Amino acid sequence: MFGDHLSGIYEKAFDPAISWEERLLRARELGFNYVEISIDEKDERIARLYDSGAALSELRAACANTGMQIKSMCLSAHRRFPFGSADAAVRARARDIMDRAIDFSCELGIRVIQLAGYDVYYEPSTPESVRAFREGMLWAAGRAERSQVMLAMEIMDTPFMNSITKHMGYEAMIRSPWYKVYPDLGNLSAWGENDPAQELARGMGSIVAVHLKDTIAVTDSCEGKFKCVPFGSGCVDFTARFAELERLGYKGPYMIEMWYADGTSDTAEIASAAKWLQERFAEAEKLVGGSSNA
């Protein structure tokens, strides 16, 4: 799909009514190598981490029956239960969710947990919330290191963690081989202060995977749009970003992040997005001398 890179597709790109086995089967038939599972702030998704075993058994069976893997987790539950909360009970819940997400990943063979880079989301950010977030990240990295599960910070839709440069400060502080970065090309491109080419170069050696998503840029007159932007209608120059990553020698996976819309065909929408992105990747290959086969 994207040269020699593995390709992933987000769980939420599919109709939520279908089973995991059907979701994985559709992903395989569309040409993907794996699916990224979502543990967001909804109770039913957080509950997966607290299940007595039924959820894991279903997922293991679905993977075995389809020959597909769930290789990564998008862990955005910390938007609701942030490490930087002023409430000690919320901070404790953040750690419990992280602890269970790591155990869940070990049980299922998930390699990478993508973290949400918010000190807080529904509370005001303060020096105390930033300090608590740092403490939480130090703890989380140690917990992940013990279990050999990679934690990778997403570049976000708020100023707190909206660049690879900001992440690298945390990486330097934490100093763990199990705490890296998982940039979202859409979020990275939406902030005018970012030079995406320089940001990607700065992160090389730390980038474990890349989210493919389009966005509407943040400007003085527009707050930006970070979700459900059709590929090709936003601000991301995918050809340039692919070319930069290829020149830098990036070998990790590309993961398409998109969301199912009611009344649509998930397979048709995903196939259309994948085709469009493959065309941009082919353009990038020409720019760098055709070093891979699309």
Label the model's feature ranges:
Residues 40, 78, 118, 215, ...:
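Flexible loop residues that form catalytic
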Residues 7-10, 43-46, 85-88, 124-126, ...:
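A short, structure-level motif marking secondary-structure boundaries and short turns
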Residues 1-107, 138, 176, 205, ...:
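N-terminal pre-domain/capping segments
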Residues 1-8, 13-33, 160-183, 189-294:
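Histidine-acidic metal/acid-base catalytic patches
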Residues 36, 72, 114, 152, ...:
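Conserved beta-strand positions in the central sheet of alpha/beta enzyme cores
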Residues 33-34, 69, 111, 150, ...:
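Residue-level detector of anion-binding/catalytic polar loops
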